[in-house]
């Protein structure tokens, strides 16, 4: 018997796991009991449980020992004990990939699959499909077709789910079962209907027309399964994002109609789908927000959490749409669930007024230590949106500095540091307070990335403060106490103080001379370089070599250096071979209006022209609808040999860079013109469409197609 532990033991973790100290060799030794006659179901169950526990804990089983245990386990099919038989099915599925000759149990599983015991049939189908390969699938095809349309829902669902897995092995064979899947889709059982819809979609997902027909059929005839409705909403949403009809499509009407469904799950899925559609207007969002507002007062914590989390996302882009929910969100501030209360406060910070900031900050500071790092990051992001209130910067800075002192992971600390840095850079009045908090933080900072980032900021902003000398101690402490990367960053920061403050220069030169004795090459090289530059006492040299740094493309330089090391050459590395980095374009930031941020309106004719131009290029035909085109950005000076402007066209998973090029040399004719791009690691250049020719003073257009990474926030 397994001892029953009380709640206190469970929470402390002491003795709550009876399998905690299992040894694989001892368990495999115990498995020999499978060969005994008569079979003892209770003892065999306990041993199978131990084997499954070890497998799920990641314990490695060798092929020979796994095969031995598997063959011994097959003898347990002689027992008629239901629990033992179902445990055998589980073990077969887990050991299918590590044992040899697992097909030996095919006949036993087929017998159970076609037998009269319904309790065996479903699990037997799942286990059989787990050990079946492409060559054996046709042998059980007849049984699978019968199982899909079986009257017993557990059998039908098992066959449908197994069909989904079998598609990866033999899509063509499973495609022949489409008629049976369609019959199952009309089942009265909610899970059978849901699984059947999943099979039908995966069989047709590469055929847009077939998927559209399937959607039309089910949206007209209706469904009994709330799970199937949720899947239909997701399919419709995916098609809508790729469609050119936009929100005038019948698909949008279907999703909106689901807001009036009797199932809460379907209502939330529809609201979430509408909110995540690109280019959604406030009018189109209104019904979804109204539904979420009702969920905010639900007695169910899961519904309240889902509603407030979704409203939190809406508030980032459409704060005015959420202001109607402010009263409901105020009521959630005191919710017993800390996650719900946190999201309610952060949403109100995005949508509320300046007068409410103090109260909300005080409210959240009372329990911020109790919430997880994930929600602390959400809090910091919400606070960063309140930067439009300069009079509240001191309150925000105090709150952030207190959070910075608390324990937390890298992402949490990074969010706080980024928020303080943005306040320092945008508000001169908060500069000294922000720098003081950051100096205190790097005295005990375990994250190299954050320490170097703060040192860079100190080097940039510190020399321009009224008393720059007070930061020198904090920076030089890093040279004495930290690792190589931080020491190197500290040396660069010191050099910037010496370059901009004549009174501090003698002290900085002494400190740099000490750094020349460092054990690390990088630190010594930087110190030597900066010392020699500063000793010249020339502002032009300081500007070129200390303030501005490298103007080349960093990814381009990395690739060029890697190529240089692969092909040994006597010639020195040529920096001129590296493409220059694009100068940062500082756009005037529009203040974050917590009521209604007016989106930048592009003339419809311009957007339509771009859509038409891009659709005419074969390489861009399948990119889907064009979401937005940026304003032209000038990449070169007007008087250079070649004048280049860039327009970025945003699609669902891609960006098209349009380069408008003009040749200003009257004695040259360029042909097949492209613009070389060096993307970061996670981005991928798929193709370039060159401009056929570029005669004198006649503009030409070339394009570059780049795939966005999955985790990219713009994707």
From Swiss-Prot:
Record-linked Pfam families: Adaptin_N (PF01602), COP-gamma_platf (PF08752)
Residues in HEAT repeats: 64-101, 283-320, 321-355, 356-391, 394-429, 466-503
Chain intervals with Basic and acidic residues compositional bias: 1-11
UniProt keyword terms in alphabetical order: Cytoplasm, Cytoplasmic vesicle, ER-Golgi transport, Golgi apparatus, Membrane, Phosphoprotein, Protein transport, Repeat, Transport
Keyword Repeat recorded: yes
Gene3D superfamilies: Coatomer, gamma subunit, appendage domain (2.60.40.1480), Leucine-rich Repeat Variant (1.25.10.10)
Domain of life: Eukaryota
Localization terms from the record: Cytoplasm, Cytosol; Golgi apparatus membrane; Cytoplasmic vesicle, COPI-coated vesicle membrane
Database matches in InterPro entries: ARM-like (IPR011989), ARM-type_fold (IPR016024), Clathrin/coatomer_adapt-like_N (IPR002553), Clathrin_app_Ig-like_sf (IPR013041), Coatomer_gsu (IPR017106), Coatomer_gsu_app_Ig-like_dom (IPR013040), Coatomer_gsu_app_sf (IPR037067)
One MF annotation (Gene Ontology) recorded for this entry: structural molecule activity
Entry keyword Nucleus: no
Recorded family membership: Belongs to the COPG family.
Function of the molecule: The coatomer is a cytosolic protein complex that binds to dilysine motifs and reversibly associates with Golgi non-clathrin-coated vesicles, which further mediate biosynthetic protein transport from the ER, via the Golgi up to the trans Golgi network. Coatomer complex is required for budding from Golgi membranes, and is essential for the retrograde Golgi-to-ER transport of dilysine-tagged proteins.
PANTHER family to which the protein is assigned, alphabetical: COATOMER SUBUNIT GAMMA, COATOMER SUBUNIT GAMMA-2
Protein name (database record): Coatomer subunit gamma-2
